């Protein structure tokens, strides 16, 4: 004969149901917390990787295409050359140190052999025809004049095509910024004027970011926020080096990256050493 559950059996079943429900609740709750923590830490590791990769891009170009011969580390376009092409300046602002150096991040052209009576063959990469893009004309390892993209007359120059030399041609006579002319010869170079590269921190939307700015010639700086940080310390290497004469060959950055998730703050401090 079938009969219903007794009161005790009902209470036991209810208790087991509550225990199972609580177990599932806390399991889902804490798995969500652990997942959130893992995601926050994973993001921090990615911040550090991104920062190192981006900063390395600029340090690989430190000193490239930079004239020298001035009395200090100041560079001003067109003729205020720094004392040494590997000059580096360290400053500080708030929680972060600042690093400034000079380098070419864009176009160049190397004059090769004669193509015809009006042009030379050339190896070129990332050249432009913009009148606001400035270039130094180099002869025997020093700039002799200044020109602009629209005065050079480059044909071709796709640096994405590897193994093809020459990949461009250039006029033998180049009009300069002061309305004169320069006659090119084999071995001469036309190189985009160097940029002032600054690594620093400042706020964006109320949050402190590691940033890089590039400033070319008489143009305004172009700022690129990289990742959120709490602080950054920079040390010139080797320690005690003279930053004005090329003795400093690297910088050690100690950067504390930050990731805020709700009311929680996660940080990761990493040393990054970059140089030329």
From Swiss-Prot:
<keyword id="KW-0812">Transmembrane</keyword>
<keyword id="KW-1133">Transmembrane helix</keyword>
<feature type="transmembrane region" description="Helical">
    <location>
        <begin position="5"/>
        <end position="26"/>
    </location>
</feature>
<keyword id="KW-0472">Membrane</keyword>
<dbReference type="InterPro" id="IPR012902">
    <property type="entry name" value="N_methyl_site"/>
</dbReference>
<protein>
    <recommendedName>
        <fullName>Uncharacterized protein aq_1436</fullName>
    </recommendedName>
</protein>
<feature type="propeptide" description="Leader sequence">
    <location>
        <begin position="1"/>
        <end position="4"/>
    </location>
</feature>
<dbReference type="GO" id="GO:0016020">
    <property type="term" value="C:membrane"/>
</dbReference>
<feature type="modified residue" description="N-methylmethionine">
    <location>
        <position position="5"/>
    </location>
</feature>
<dbReference type="Pfam" id="PF07963">
    <property type="entry name" value="N_methyl"/>
</dbReference>
<keyword id="KW-0488">Methylation</keyword>
């Amino acid at each position: 004969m079938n009969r219903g559950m007794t009161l005790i059996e009902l209470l036991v079943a209810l208790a087991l149901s509550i225990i199972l429900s609580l177990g599932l609740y806390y399991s889902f709750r804490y798995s969500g917390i652990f997942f959130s923590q893992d995601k926050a830490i994973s993001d921090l590791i990615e911040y550090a990787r991104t920062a190192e990769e981006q900063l390395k891009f600029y340090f690989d170009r430190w000193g490239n295409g930079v004239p020298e011969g001035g009395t200090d580390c100041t560079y001003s376009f067109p003729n205020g050359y720094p004392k040494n092409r590997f000059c580096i300046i360290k400053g500080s602002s708030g929680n972060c140190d600042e690093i400034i150096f000079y380098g070419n991040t864009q176009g160049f052209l190397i004059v090769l052999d004669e193509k015809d009576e009006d042009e030379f063959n050339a190896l070129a990469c990332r050249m432009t025809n913009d009148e606001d893009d400035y270039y130094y004309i180099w002869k025997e390892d020093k700039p002799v004049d200044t020109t602009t993209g629209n005065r050079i007359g480059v044909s071709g120059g796709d640096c994405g095509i590897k193994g093809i030399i020459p990949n461009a041609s250039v006029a033998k006579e180049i009009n300069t910024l002061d309305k004169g002319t320069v006659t090119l010869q084999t071995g001469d170079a036309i190189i985009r004027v160097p940029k002032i590269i600054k690594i620093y921190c400042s706020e964006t939307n109320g949050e402190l970011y590691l940033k890089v700015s590039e400033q070319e010639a008489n143009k305004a700086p172009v700022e690129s926020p990289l990742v959120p940080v709490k602080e950054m310390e920079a040390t010139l290497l080797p320690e005690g080096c003279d930053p004005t004469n090329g003795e400093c060959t690297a910088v050690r950055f100690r950067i504390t990256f930050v990731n805020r998730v709700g009311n929680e703050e996660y940080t990761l401090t990493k040393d990054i050493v970059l140089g030329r």
